[in-house]
Design a protein with these regions (language model features):
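Extended, Lys/Arg-rich, non-catalytic nucleic-acid recognition/anchoring regions
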Residues: 1-350, 354
Length: 361
């Protein structure tokens, strides 16, 4: 009677396309599909041969980092897609990994959302925990240090970096004071200023590699690439392992497992090119310095290095000249250091200004 009543009300066996049917767990649908294919496979050779593909049609999901799949051959809609194809073959769930380069697609997905260098037009920023960017942050903060209101010597600054930051994960004022007293540099009553409490910057990745990957022959470039991979693919451990196996075949399974336990997130505000390739002559000697050289050899922070005393800003302006896009397009807004919501507001404002100029002639 119950079944007849449900049939009369058109409520018996609701269609899968009905949103109300979504309350049934996905696993139950999959179980039913497998049972149906199992029964049909005993009667039909075609079903039996294609059962796995049918299941894949049901279970397959395009990874979020691959995004919209553009048609083979390209077209106008390609600008909204970042998926990288290995070939122009027709795409199916069962040949997805052979047609789509998931690693490169994931890299593009992250990179298209990251900001560009604050000073150099179009240059990608470094990961926040990059070895180079971490060193920059430490030196930029350390160069503000004052003892009894006076700047410390460059030699002492370098010693603090090597003896404290390179040997201690977190450098506090207490540790700094103890170090200075132990080295005979100052007394207990010394007034430490120029920093806001404890040091905020640290060499996190440097210590991670030193502690967790002992005995592994990795160059500075290799370590930077590993850090970049963790930032790009850290949310997908399987993809990260796959990437590391391909790029570093000399690493053992245990070493790769150790790497996947590391966690680095976020991006800095500066590019490698800005820190290492923008150069200017040293004021006193005329020696060619990069930003990193100047931070190490002086007690000036970045803002001081970009002042008129040094010539770094001239090099920055020379680099940017001719590279900036003077046309009004959303792509030019994309490269600004602003959140997506702010970028939209800037773009809308520019469109209003453009319309006013058109109306005013």
């Amino acid at each position: 009677e119950y079944l007849l009543g449900e049939i009369e009300k058109d409520l018996f066996l609701p269609k899968p396309v009905n949103k109300d049917n979504s309350v049934i767990p996905y696993q139950i649908h999959l179980y039913e599909l497998n049972r149906i294919l199992e029964n049909l496979g005993a009667k039909s050779e075609i079903i039996k041969e294609n059962a796995a593909k049918i299941v894949q049609l049901f279970t397959f999901r395009i990874p979020y980092y691959v995004g919209p799949i553009h048609a083979a051959g390209g077209g106008e809609k390609d600008k909204f897609s970042w998926a990288v194809r290995k070939s122009d073959e027709k795409l199916y769930p069962w040949n997805f990994d052979q047609i789509i380069d998931t690693e490169e697609s994931a890299k593009r997905f992250i990179r298209r959302m990251t900001n560009k260098c604050t000073y150099l037009y179009g240059e990608d920023v470094l990961p926040k925990d990059s070895l180079l960017y971490s060193k920059f942050m430490v030196l930029n903060e350390l160069n503000n240090l004052r003892l009894d209101g006076e700047k410390i010597s460059v030699k002492l600054k370098q010693k603090i970096y090597n003896e404290l930051f390179c040997k201690t994960r977190k450098v506090t004022q207490k540790k700094l004071r103890s170090f200075l007293i132990r080295e005979g540099v100052t007394e207990k009553t010394v007034e430490i200023s120029g920093i806001d409490g404890d040091f905020k910057a640290s060499l996190k990745a440097y210590h991670d590699f030193k502690e967790k990957l002992t005995g592994v022959a990795l160059s500075q470039e290799d370590k930077e690439e590993i850090i970049l991979n963790i930032v790009l693919f850290g949310d997908d451990k399987k993809l990260l392992k796959q990437r590391l196996h391909k790029q570093f075949p000399n690493l053992t399974e245990n070493q790769i497992k150790s790497i996947t336990t590391l966690s680095y997130q976020g991006w800095g505000r500066l590019s490698r090119k800005f820190l290492e390739e923008i150069t200017a002559p040293a004021p006193e000697t005329g020696e060619v310095w990069s930003i990193m050289n100047a931070l190490w050899e002086t007690n000036d922070n970045l803002m001081q290095l970009l002042s008129q005393e040094y010539k770094f800003m001239e090099s920055v302006e020379e680099y940017n000249s001719g590279r900036e896009d003077r046309t009004l397009s959303y792509e030019s807004i994309q490269n600004t250091y602003a959140s997506p919501s702010v970028k939209r507001q800037i773009w809308q404002t520019l469109q209003v200004v453009k319309e006013i100029r058109t109306v005013m002639g």
